[in-house]
């Protein structure tokens, strides 16, 4: 198997774990009697660790030039720390175990992303063909675990997740390093970070990820509480990822006709609609399906457009740090704030208000894009 195949396999296992863990772990926590607030805290630990951990791991990798070794070691540590879920149901014990898990788990993706782009150096347009297998892995497990949990105890989700983590570790062992050139490792980025468009793009990304906080923490709980089966919950999660894949495939064509600014504005507008539908139209399966298809815009198109903007605004030697910074600001700070806000609102105000708040966050991001992201990207393809 060539490096393309090994990278594709790694993405498959990595996102397969996320597909088994993210949508259903909150249901397990609910089953052991934890409050919505404590569930939100545990589910937001991933975002909390992404505040600073990616910057630390990327610095270590760049200074030592041993990305694969760090990926392997951190995945092994994540596997060991995840095992705490089999040993305790105590909140403090789970808090410590999940904190350690996410500290090490946060190392892998940015380093493998850099590894992939370095491997594809002359053909970055092929990135989607490799990254696509991550979405496939997510679909397989989110549907499979959903059907499994209709007949098996919720605790079985933990074992599935553990074995998928093991698969990720074994896959990481097959990866090989890509040599970096001096030009790829050089270059201060403060001058770029001070630019208005960069500040507004990062801030908008924070609000978009914060808006998704309610979705990632409480979407499954929300649907199960309305009487939907866990297999249907899995299908709805899968629809979102299918929409994401379709958008990834279509983005090069779309961006030849629509500017990056227009794409981002559409993403935030559709995200605003999506979260209102989830909160207020949960009894309509048709509207829920439509809302999940909008994941193609609220995540897929937004992610692709943001990556394209960073690729255009930062030179090659700044890309790794730019990606790590965006991950810390958007997925770290934004994800953490969104999850904690959702946890605070869920029990006190209810599901509809919680998802309305998510919609308001997306609307705030729309305003930031409108005010701060220039419309100068027409004709430059988003890869």
Walk through the language-model features, giving the residues of each:
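Juxtamembrane intracellular "pre-TM" segments in multi-pass secondary transporters
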Residues: 1, 174-207
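Helix-loop boundary and gating motifs at the non-cytosolic
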Residues: 1-50, 198-205, 209-236
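Hydrophobic core of transmembrane alpha-helices in multi-pass small-molecule transporters
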Residues: 12, 81, 91-109, 206, ...
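Interfacial helix-cap and linker-helix signal at transmembrane-aqueous boundaries
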Residues: 29-30, 60-61, 132, 147-152, ...
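Helix-to-loop junctions at the C-terminal end of transmembrane segments
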Residues: 52-66, 149-150, 246-260, 346
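Structural signature of the two symmetry-related core transmembrane helices
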Residues: 69-83, 162, 262-277
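Cytoplasmic helix-loop-helix junction between adjacent transmembrane helices
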Residues: 98-133
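Symmetry-related core transmembrane helices of the 12-TM Major Facilitator Superfamily/SLC fold
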Residues: 156-173, 353-371
């Amino acid at each position: 198997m060539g490096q393309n195949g090994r990278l594709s396999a790694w993405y498959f296992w990595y996102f397969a774990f996320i597909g088994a863990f993210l949508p259903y772990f909150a249901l397990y926590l609910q089953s052991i009697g934890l409050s919505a607030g404590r569930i939100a805290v545990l589910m937001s630990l991933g975002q909390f660790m992404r505040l600073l951990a990616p910057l630390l791991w990327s610095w270590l990798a760049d200074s030592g030039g041993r990305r694969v070794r760090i990926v392997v070691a951190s995945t092994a540590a994540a596997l060991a720390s995840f095992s705490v879920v089999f040993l305790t149901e105590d909140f403090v014990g789970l808090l410590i175990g999940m904190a350690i898990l996410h500290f090490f788990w946060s190392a892998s993706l940015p380093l493998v992303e850099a590894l992939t782009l370095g491997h594809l150096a002359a053909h970055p347009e092929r990135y989607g063909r490799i990254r696509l297998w991550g979405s496939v892995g997510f679909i397989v497990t989110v549907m499979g675990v959903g059907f499994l949990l209709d007949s098996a105890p919720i605790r079985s989700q933990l074992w599935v997740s553990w074995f998928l983590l093991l698969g990720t570790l074994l896959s990481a062992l097959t990866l090989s390093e890509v040599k970096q050139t001096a030009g790829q490792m050089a270059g201060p980025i403060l001058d770029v970070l001070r630019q208005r468009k960069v500040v507004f793009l990062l801030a908008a990304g924070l609000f978009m990820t914060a808006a998704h906080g309610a979705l990632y923490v409480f979407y499954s709980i929300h649907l199960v509480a309305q009487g939907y089966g866990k297999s249907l919950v899995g299908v709805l999660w899968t629809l979102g990822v299918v929409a994401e894949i379709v958008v990834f495939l279509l983005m090069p064509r779309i961006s030849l006709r629509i500017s990056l600014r227009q794409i981002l504005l559409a993403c935030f507008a559709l995200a605003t609609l999506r979260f209102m539908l989830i909160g207020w139209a949960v009894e309509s399966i048709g509207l829920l399906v439509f809302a999940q298809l909008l994941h193609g815009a609220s995540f897929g198109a937004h992610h692709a457009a943001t990556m394209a903007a960073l690729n255009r605004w930062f030179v090659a030697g700044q890309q790794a740090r730019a990606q790590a910074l965006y991950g810390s600001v958007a997925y770290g700070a934004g994800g953490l704030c969104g999850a904690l806000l959702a946890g605070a609102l869920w029990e006190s105000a209810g599901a509809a208000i919680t998802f309305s708040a998510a919609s308001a966050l997306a609307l705030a991001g729309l305003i930031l894009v409108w005010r701060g992201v220039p419309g100068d990207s027409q004709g430059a393809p988003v890869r």
